[in-house]
């Protein structure tokens, strides 16, 4: 088991992003048996320029017996844009959903915050243990819900996509993310591997999830402007949403 390391750019980011990154890394370290995950060469820490402003991307990646990759990305563009992106990719033989969380913060505050446990089963439903635990969580009340993208069918009924308007809503979102993480890590530790056709069904579910996420045009456009098309394609398909074998 290894210890997580604190990202260098963490103090430069929006406070909620810092709190979420710390909570994510803490859950991984406390609940799971971590080992290193090697990213493609040169993609762990990246600097570039976009429209005259400095762009920094810093990644943390680990793996466990249940997860083939657990990825936390933090990014900062000048003084106007902070981003957190996190996905936990199960090993295909484990019948687990995809944990995903994203936050975008601009000069006017946080414009988007999303968290979900997205199903990978053949019928696109969550395991019963997840449904029971998620249904038991306190209700979440936010003033401004966001619309899901056209490919949003990959998300579960528990997906939370909002624009927090107050510090209280930011704290409530942070609590919801930590609740999702706790449920996910506990269920993962108790999960038993599948074999044969069942495992192939979950493998296809994860491929569908990654394929749909690769359609995120906003992310791709930013990367293309800063680093070029070839680099953006390599990053989108090799780091953000690589397809499992």
Swiss-Prot record:
Database matches in Gene3D superfamilies: 3.40.1500.20
EC number: 1.3.7.5
Keyword Nucleotide-binding: no
Any Gene Ontology biological process: phytochromobilin biosynthetic process
Gene Ontology MF terms: cobalt ion binding; phycocyanobilin:ferredoxin oxidoreductase activity
Function description: Catalyzes the four-electron reduction of biliverdin IX-alpha (2-electron reduction at both the A and D rings); the reaction proceeds via an isolatable 2-electron intermediate, 181,182-dihydrobiliverdin.
Name of the molecule in the record: Phycocyanobilin:ferredoxin oxidoreductase
InterPro entries noted in UniProt: Ferredoxin-dep_bilin_Rdtase, Ferredoxin_bilin_OxRdtase
This protein's UniProt keywords: Oxidoreductase
Reaction equations catalysed: (2R,3Z)-phycocyanobilin + 4 oxidized [2Fe-2S]-[ferredoxin] = biliverdin IXalpha + 4 reduced [2Fe-2S]-[ferredoxin] + 4 H(+)
Xref: NCBIfam families: PRK02816.1 (NF002760)
Catalytic EC class: oxidoreductase
Family statement drawn from the similarity comment of this UniProt entry: Belongs to the HY2 family.
């Amino acid at each position: 088991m290894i210890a997580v390391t604190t990202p260098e750019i963490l103090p430069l980011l929006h406070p909620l992003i810092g709190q979420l990154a710390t909570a994510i890394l803490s859950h991984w370290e406390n609940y799971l048996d971590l080992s290193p995950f090697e990213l493609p060469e040169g993609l762990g820490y990246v600097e570039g320029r976009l429209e005259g402003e400095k762009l920094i991307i810093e990644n943390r990646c680990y793996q466990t017996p249940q997860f083939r990759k657990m990825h936390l990305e933090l990014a900062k563009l000048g003084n106007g844009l902070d981003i957190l992106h996190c996905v936990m990719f199960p090993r295909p033989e484990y019948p687990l959903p995809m944990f995903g969380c994203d936050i975008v913060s601009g000069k006017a505050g946080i414009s988007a915050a999303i968290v979900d446990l997205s199903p990978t089963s053949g019928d696109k439903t969550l395991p019963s243990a997840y449904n029971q635990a998620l249904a038991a969580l306190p209700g979440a009340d936010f003033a401004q819900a966001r619309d899901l993208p056209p490919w949003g069918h990959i998300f579960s009924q528990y997906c939370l996509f909002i624009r927090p308007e107050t510090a209280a809503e930011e704290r409530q979102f942070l609590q919801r993310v930590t609740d999702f993480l706790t449920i996910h890590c506990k269920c993962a530790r108790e999960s038993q591997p599948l074999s044969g056709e069942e495992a192939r069904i979950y493998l296809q579910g994860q491929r569908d999830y990654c394929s749909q996420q690769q359609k995120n045009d906003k992310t791709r456009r930013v990367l293309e402007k800063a680093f070029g098309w070839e680099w953006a394609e390599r990053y989108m398909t090799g780091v953000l949403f690589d397809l499992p074998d």
